[in-house]
């Protein structure tokens, strides 16, 4: 990972140390090779489904899926895509909660490879550094662009921000609809799943925790 940014390496190391990194096999193939291999295998899957790839509507589907997997919905598996992070010295001595609400996210359930669609609320109490607000959204999006379970996704965002900001005072909450529940199995179209991960004062201080939870509209 020598070509990665310092921030990407720090976050990856922190997640590995805590056993919260997405399970990976090791050194990945270069993107173009991955796309070619996925296209080959997806062609076979579609044939096994008895689809006729000579039809002009289906002919390019294996290639489209391969490109989508590598470049888009699973791009967060590659730390070279980790967002460029802007950290600013906390010269104003901000010591109150900073909250970004309703961050849209789309991820993929790693059990069935169907959509997870939700929103995240992220808060932190600055110490020595503050982060550009859009970078919080980008970090949420980066970890969403992987096969995921919502519990791990919530914790990965928390650990990433704690690592970058140099403070434990971070909180993350995610509300999401899981299409593995909505579109198959029980086929429940109305239920949502909420996960919360709290650090520092958000865990130890009841007042701070309640203030955060009020921003998520859970209490």
Curated annotation (Swiss-Prot):
GO terms for molecular function: GTP binding; GTP cyclohydrolase I activity; zinc ion binding. The keyword NAD does not apply. Keywords: GTP-binding, Hydrolase, Metal-binding, Nucleotide-binding, One-carbon metabolism, Zinc. One of its GO terms (cellular component) is cytoplasm. PANTHER family: GTP CYCLOHYDROLASE 1, GTP CYCLOHYDROLASE I. Zn(2+) binds at residues 109, 112, 180. This is GTP cyclohydrolase 1.
